[in-house]
Amino acid sequence: MTVWNGLPTWVTFSPLLGMLVLLFIPRQQNRWLKWVGMAGTVPPLILALIMFAKFDPQARGVQFAQNVSWIHIPLPQSSGWKLSYAMGADGLSISLVVMTTIIAALAAVGSMYLKERLKSYFLLFLLLEIGMLGVFLARDLFLFFLFFEVTLVATFFLVGIWGYMERERAANQFLLYNGLGSALMLLAFISLMFVFGTLNLDQLQVRTSQLFAHPEWMQGPVKPVIWGIFLCILVAFGIKLPAFPFHTWMLRVHVEAPPAVVMIHSGVLLKMGAYGLIRFGVDLFPPLVHQMATCLAALGLVNILYGAALAFVQRDLKRVLAYSSVSHMGIILFGIAALNFTGLQGAVFQAVSHGFISALMFLIVAALYERTGTTMIDEMSGLAKAMPVLSGVLLAGGLALLGLPGMSGFVSEFLAFLGMFKPYPVIAGIGALGLILAAVYTLRAVMAATFGPFLDRWERLTDSKAVETVPMLVLLGLIIAIGVYPQMLGEPMQTTLQMIVTRIGG
Amino acid sequence: MEKALAHIDWSAMTPELILVTAAALLIVLELLLPDEASRDWLGWLALLAVVGAGTYVAVHFGATAVDLLQGSYRTDPVAQSFKLVLLGGSALILLMSLSRENREGIRARGEYYFLLLTAVLGASMMTSSADLVTLFVGLELLSISSYILAGIRKQRTDSNEAAWKYVVLGGVSSAFILYGMSFVYGLTGSTNLFVVQQRIVEAYQTGYASFVLLSLFLMMLGFGFKIAAAPFHMWAPDVYQGSPTSVTAFLAVVSKTAAFALVTRIVLVAYLQLIELRVWEEIITPLLLVIAGASMIIGNAVALRQTNVKRLMAYSGIAQAGYVLVPLASLGMALFESTLYYLLAYSLMTVGVFAVIMAVERDAEHGELSAFAGLYRRSPLVALTMTLMVLSLAGIPVTAGFFGKFYILINAIATQHFWIAAVMVVTTVISYFYYFELIRQMYFRPAPKGNPLAIPISTAIVIGIGVIGTVGLGLFPNAVLHALGQLKWTEVLSIPQTPPGP
């Protein structure tokens, strides 16, 4: 296995290759810039697939681990702080990494509608990919934070420069909310360093277990600090997820960002919130999560119902999808709050599945917008006649979104709710209403857009081109593959999730 | 005790001697040169002197403390590290003002260079003094040189206004400092900081507690002004805006670093023994933390409304002063390391930012934020370097500014001053708005002109050093941390082996 130890590093930094080539292409060469930009997402995809293939689902602990000491802060009266460059993959991160590389590659294809400033666009795009991959593969909290901030800065530019009319407000709001989230996260991480003396994830796991094994800590002075850290982490990743009431920034980004960035944002960036909640919330502070579980469940319920209800009244397809994301993130919260194996599995499944589904939906929206110049549902009416293929894919995506059996959304929702019904049957029961609402709002939107009276101005519209159809079909294929054969996703994460569940004693 | 002048080891003062010689030489040359002769080479001479002084300090870095002139002058690790930062900053600023394009309407070139040198000399003296008198002499040398520098563009009203404000308010603050120092002398009968350190506790315990505190408060009033900390910051925006950009950069970087050296030394050395009486904990720490917190809040909040770049940088500097005060206030465990690291990072990024501002201002012929509009389209590389340095000022990883703030935050949390940590964090997020406003201008706004921004070669070098330093220190802070960790800071606080007489 030693040959593969550097694999996480290679995966994370492989987009640099594309960036390097991009630097040497003149600004006017749009064709070349597009091709190189798309090609730049291929090396991480290939390397991630290699990693996935080499990943041993039975092995406990981190694989392909790499640990190099990096920064040593000398402090008097102690040996100082050691921050390390530690990378590695476990069952939780491997599926998210593969998902990230796939969505990034497809989003790069989805960037074809852009016409200006392609060079800086693709440079930032690949930088964003580095940040995202690093977030999922870092095994040191300091390093995690650095990658996390890279995604923040890159997204700010991508939204602010290439977005729609209100792009600057969206970028600003994004910066404010997420900046505050990162700041809280940093405070939490520094405090963790003080309490446990390390920011290495594996060491932290050992030391938090040791602390929680002695119930006396509840009486000690460390109790408020631990709670403070835990709450900071909850809020920081709650903003990212986003959990109600921190979701407003995300709606704006969904509506204003360029389509490819929304694919990434909705597909991957929101999942960093879920990842952080499980990795740093659930896994490091089991007893605290137990006490907060009801609260998380209630938040999840609010997310599900609030998102679904508002998705129903939206007239803009992008806003329907944005609110449906809020609703679907509630299901992730449900899965986490369940605190059992099934629920957690549902949460991770939902993260991956929603990543693919929302990427697909936004790709379709982008294609529709490119042709019709609108995203308002009422104005789209009757598209099916002019564009049977696109409308068909939209319908299929809608079915995935509402959780049709045989597609990934069903498996995820099923698992999350199954997990939830054991500890909180009532909340889960009410939450299940969200599934019905999802069917209502999805079908309403999709039907109104594709069927309904045919408008004369759609006469001359062309159906989707191969370059659009291929990524759509790939995503659809993945969604169905997970739906039909969930083991593909479930197996690699099994051991890791079981370890987490053992730690939380659920 | 009495030593003949010949027996004193003058080599420890080499940096100052180089600077004073060069300044004197420059004055003489300025007088002797015919009016029409070019004065450009005087700038190179000044640069050579500063680089020479800096090299000397760098070579002897880490040497043990040396006392000179009856203990009034000292070269110790603190002095050396502060000196390196401010000599480095001065060298970059000199380099920036050398090129023909960057004259900014300063007619008296010779005067400009020797005033810069005397200012650096004053700053350098401040870092090395162990006596209230030498400290004050250094401070005034720096201040008076700066007053003239601020108003060196005699024909411009805003420059005049800047100098005028600076002189009046600077004079008042010097008076406060002097008044405070007089109490210290009255209470302890000495101006030597180490003697003061030993005797002030006695004074505190024998019924003069209120006078001890009064002396500190009075000095803090003056220091607050010198480091441009709130609520004594009012002068900074006007002076920053009215001065030539190179002088603004000097005030922001060198002046501020020197003032921090002064504050650290006086507060820490003179009042150190009060820790045992819990006076630090109960009075000094809250006092400094309130100043720090007010600076962060006022600086960052008011910066949001600025439209002039140099005013924006002034408020940003006020906020940064607040951050740097935290380790001193909380007596953090890595007080010197974090302060110096931050000042070094701050100097690098600020000098670089001002170098860009100078070029942009000259090109647009005004200093409003809109001068940066569309810079990315005109000169992508300049925009990118500016972005990196502004991100560093905002404290975004992977930059020196981030690591500096991180380090200071560690100090605040380690000493359990959570509220100041919270203020730091919240104001940092607020600061994103105005720092990103610069970025928004550069990337999101259309460019009024199409031609690339002209950057003189010397300015380009300064920007290059700023960016490389900012990113390098952000990625590999160990390089500096290791060196700082090696130094024996405690030597600074301890009393020299042969305490000099009163």
Model-derived features: positions:
Chain B
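Alpha-helical transmembrane segments of multi-pass membrane proteins predominantly involved
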Residues: 1-502
